[in-house]
Structures are given as C-alpha cells and as structure tokens.
C-alpha cells in the first residue's frame, strides 16, 4: 500500500475549526517540523497505527509513559477490572494507599506522597509547598528546562515553549515572573552567583536531573551534587523533577542513578501507566505542611482516581522485574550508537546523548552537548528533513528537535534493526 496521509490531513483541517491549532498540546501540531500531524487510531507494543493505516515504530511513547510498550496486557487488565467498580468516587480508596506505599518502597526519599493528576500539578504544588515551608518567594529554574505550564515556570522554558519560540509566555504577569530566577543548566557558577545575590529569598531550586525538554542533556559530573550543596548552604529546598526521568533512567529514577537526595520529588508519566497521574513527595516534615495537616493548600477532584491508581500499580509492579533496566539501557545504547554510526557512514555530523531508556540526537559538529546554548545552535533544518524522511520509513520520532526520544521494553531487536536501516537510508538522502 502506498504511503498516504489523506485522512490525517482531513482530520487536521477539521480539528483546526474546533480546537486551537488543531491539537490539545502544542508540540503535537508539527510546528517544529512542518507538515501534517499523524492522527493515531491505535497503538500496540512498540507500534503506532495512524488513521490512514500506516504503521510506525514509536520512539515517543506518549511522551514517556509507555515504558513497557503500548497496550500492555497487565495494565489493560488492571484498568478493566477497576472500571467494573466505578470510575471515580471522590473519596479515599485502598488503591491510593497501595500506590503511595509502593512509591515510598521504590523511592525511599519520598517519605510521604500526594497524588495529583498531571506533572504540571505536581511541580506547581511542590513549588507552592517549598514557598510555604521556607517562607520565601523566589525560585530557581534552568533555561531550557520544562516543568509544566504553571505561570511561575513559563520563564525561559523548554519543550513546546521552545518549539514554538515562546520561552516566555504571554499571560504571565511580570510581577509574578520576577520571582523566577533562571540559571544555566550544567553551570554551577551561574547558580552560585544567583544565590550570592538572592540566597535569603530563594525557596527552592527545581531541576530536571536529565534535561529532557531541550532534547536529552544529562548532568555533567558534580552538577547535581553542587545543587544539593548550594541548597544546604542557603536553606533552600532541592526539588528534583522526575516527571520524565522517574522510573525511566532507573527504577529509582535519576536521583537513584546519580545518587542525589532531594527534599521534594515530582513524578508523572510512567506512574500512571498511560493514565493521567502525577505525584509529589519528600521529607515527612515538609509534606506535613500540605493541607489538611498543614497550611499550604492543594486539592483535586480526581486526584487518586481509582482507575488511574490501578494502572499505576500494575505498571510499578511490572517494572520491578529483575534485569529490566539493564535490558532497556542496552536497547537504548543500540539505537543511539546505531544512529551515530549511520550518520558517520554518510558523512553527516551527529552528536548523540543517552541515559537509561531515553536518548537525543543533535545535528551538529560539536562533539559534546551539555548546555542549552549549544542545542540552540544545532541544525534544525537538518532535523526537520530527517524527521519527515524517517516518518515515511515508518519510524515515529518526537516532532521537535527539543524533545527526547524513549525506548520501551516492547522494542525488539528487529524493530531496532529496522529503525537503523531506515536511518541509514535517510542519512544517505541528506548528503
């Protein structure tokens, strides 16, 4: 069957009449690569199937949650069983207790956990808690890092904000944004200088331990340790945003992988197993400040939803199987190193980063990418061309040069081989 996008084009045209930009999250609109977004009809294992009948090997994984692959039987069974008992109660359930206990067991630095509905809710609530606990207003974040779309975090943000060229969003009052101080990721000197000026006013640092919203940028040695030391020195809290890296870089997330102890952690994506779930947690003395035990208010009609908790519990049980993360890391290494080798064979400069089950590639001749300013200098036009060539080959990558890629347990050796063979053909067309 010839490759066609006719039905996706029809749906995108219709969607733009009813939905702003035709999508419900900006990066899905393909603004970063041009063309028509593929409308997906179903997903299974490592594959997406669009409304035109095209099959794609998927390296987006619903932007991170699908660590085990799409439509995993254990998660699907748990959801179907939970649905039999009702969709939502607005009251406490056993499943949310079990979920919190399992998170604590896996990530012991999260002594108490509050469930929410998204990663944005988790980061927004954690920052409010940090401000309430410390009695300070200012926060520190990093240019190009993305922590959701709360007002205080849309200052020099990453992810779709970078894709759209709007790192400072209209609608965020200047009086509000002034409390957000922005530093350079992987540059401790910029953090130290900021604290030297505002240390007594800073409530927290919030950081992606692996920056996954300006592509994939792991921390340089000593960076996370330095943030911990600075927070300790000035009495600020360290919030590690593990919405993307949690249970993906390792079972204990990036904090376990790099051996860093945060004061607060935010989670999302994988903990919902594909359902909308977020969480934040940390030291008991800090979490005690959250209502109803403390004065910092946070609430949610659907928080701890029983169907979502069932999916999350099934996911967290499944990912604890021995050897799973070694397998994922090896699959990721094969894809990342394979892309690099395929590009080199065609004389195309490509730098690749990867850690755990996430990876990123950059069209640049710089041998190492560790900072946002380097990402911004990469060849975006080359990425766009490569993206569309790969899409026609049946490989679905994130439609933005600023987003990381994700492996799942469902990706087979054959899938990886097919991906790399496709990449070599695409690179050959780009010479």
Swiss-Prot record:
Enzyme class: isomerase
Pfam family, one: Aminotran_3
EC number(s) reported in the record: 5.4.3.8
Gene3D superfamilies: Aspartate Aminotransferase, domain 1 (3.90.1150.10), Type I PLP-dependent aspartate aminotransferase-like (Major domain) (3.40.640.10)
Cofactor annotation: pyridoxal 5'-phosphate
Coiled-coil region: none
N6-(pyridoxal phosphate)lysine sites (modified residues): 269
The keyword Cytoplasm is assigned to this record: yes
Subcellular location per the Swiss-Prot or TrEMBL entry: Cytoplasm
Highest taxon of source: Bacteria
Keyword Isomerase set for record: yes
Chief location: cytoplasm
Listed pathway(s): Porphyrin-containing compound metabolism; protoporphyrin-IX biosynthesis; 5-aminolevulinate from L-glutamyl-tRNA(Glu): step 2/2
Disulfide bonds: none
Keywords tagged on the record: Cytoplasm, Isomerase, Porphyrin biosynthesis, Pyridoxal phosphate
Catalytic activity: (S)-4-amino-5-oxopentanoate = 5-aminolevulinate
Stored SUPFAM superfamilies: PLP-dependent transferases
Gene Ontology BP, a term: protoporphyrinogen IX biosynthetic process
Cellular component per GO, a single term: cytoplasm
GO molecular function: glutamate-1-semialdehyde 2,1-aminomutase activity; pyridoxal phosphate binding; transaminase activity
Family: Belongs to the class-III pyridoxal-phosphate-dependent aminotransferase family. HemL subfamily.
Subunit structure: Homodimer.
Protein name: Glutamate-1-semialdehyde 2,1-aminomutase
Organism, as annotated: Tolumonas auensis (strain DSM 9187 / NBRC 110442 / TA 4)
Gene: hemL
